[in-house]
Amino acid sequence: MRVRGATAKRRLIGLVAAVLLLICGQVPQTAAARWKPQVGLPEWWDTDARGRGPARIILLYNSGGMPAWTVDRLRYYISHVTADGTPDHWFFDTVLVLALTGESQRSFEPNYGKGPALAEDWQQYLDGRLFGGLSELAALEKAVHEANARLGGSSHVVRVIISIPYPDPRATKFGTVEGKALNFSRAEDRAEAVRWYLREVSRRWSASQFEHLRLGGFYWVREEAPASDDDLLKLVSGLVGRQLLPFYWIPYFGSEGSGKWQELGFDVAIQQPNYFFYDVPPERIDEAARFAREHRMGVEIEMDRRVVNSPERRERYESYLNGGVDQGYLYSGTLAWYDDAALLECGQSKDPAVRRLYDTTYRFVSGKYRKQWSNDARIEK
């Protein structure tokens, strides 16, 4: 009932905007922010998989060797920070913390790193960057706490999704978990490692007693789902479901298994268009959006730090935002951002053309975006 009401409201806003366009010759910014897309929207796109309303997820990578996510860096994602360094609005509501490699550079995702990660890598990730002395979750907690103080409240909470390392079958000598030597060529040992990891994350999360963070789910880090992983994924889905948490996946464009993600047990899947990175036509964004609609998926918005120095890359990024209006995913329940820390650099930049991307992204995330017919970068309050 709430979904249908939201859809009707969106149509009414579009109609009002059209009338104003005929009368005044221009579209007011508030109406343009929700201009009717070029395609019909499925009703389920108004909520995430558990009906909790929109989720805007920023992917924060903490692979081995990457710079730590400090409070000063995180605040540009938790809140919108003005050009003079002052937080003035909340920004992303959900953070996905994920690593592709451990400190050893062994791989949590089989397409990266120097061979499969071992038990010591999984343990070190838990003990270090997640919950130990280098804990970026603790930094995130502090960043949200400080933003609450600056924005005049104390109750804002950010959801956190934690990635699950891939139990790579090549790790025939994975190491010891709870006194048992595991061999990932055996399906039961792969399952045992994931079961242990989920227990450890949940136990340590509870012990941390975060005030401003909520454990919001788990993420499958491998971006493809070969048939050989079907049984494992269904088992992991059950383990995550027992904690009453959603299970997330973000497959690349054309990835094996992406069309059957629900059968595999995922609660939320988000489609990568992969337009920003490769020499493919802009129509890729439309194609990915259509696939996402047909398969009840969200859409990933993509950029990297090349936007700082390349006008062509900035234009590519804005194609995703304009596509959100044309294809309707601006209004979808779940969107994710891959940015390679680019939004941080954009937010700190003194170059107006670069800083503009940060402000424009904020408008998109907050539902105030209008399609870019001009270089107007004003923020709606």
Which residues make up each language-model segment?
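Acidic-and-aromatic substrate-binding clefts and catalytic sites of carbohydrate-active enzymes
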Residues: Y61-Y77, E223-D230, I250-S258, P273-E283, ...
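Substrate-binding cleft of secreted/luminal carbohydrate-active enzymes
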Residues: G254, I270-K381
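Structural preference for beta-strand elements that scaffold enzyme active sites
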Residues: R56-I58, F91-L96, V157-I161, R214-Y219, ...
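Aromatic-lined carbohydrate-recognition surfaces of secreted/lumenal glycan-active proteins
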Residues: V157-D168, A181, S185-Y197, G216-E223, ...
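N-terminal catalytic cores of secreted or lumenal carbohydrate-active enzymes
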Residues: W35-R195
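Bacterial N-terminal signal peptides
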Residues: V16-C24
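Aromatic- and acid-rich polysaccharide-binding/catalytic face
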Residues: H212-R222, S258, Q262-D279
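Well-ordered, non-membrane alpha-helical segments in soluble/globular domains
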Residues: T70-V81, G115-N148, K180-R204, S228-G238, ...
